[in-house]
Amino acid sequence: MTEQNRRAVLLEAEEAVCSDRNADYGDPEDNFLDIAQLWTAYKNVPFTRADVAVFMTLVKIARMKTSPKVKDHYVDIAGYAACGYPSALADAE
């Protein structure tokens, strides 16, 4: 059952970040850049796309304190990790 649960979380995250999500939200790296630019303007502190992936993961971790059994938190964290790596690569360009 445990392996099945792990697989389910990863498959759901894959579906979220590798499917038609771009049609609704645009490319994740472009979306993270938009968010980083807004945060930078709001806080007057430089943020990167990779920062967005990390901070959104932290939002999910904070929510897990209240509701640790909500599968969506784990799925989203896996998705942010998957988008974070190419975001970090794009930041380095």
Predicted regions and their residues:
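Intrinsically disordered, low-complexity regulatory regions
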Residues: 1-93
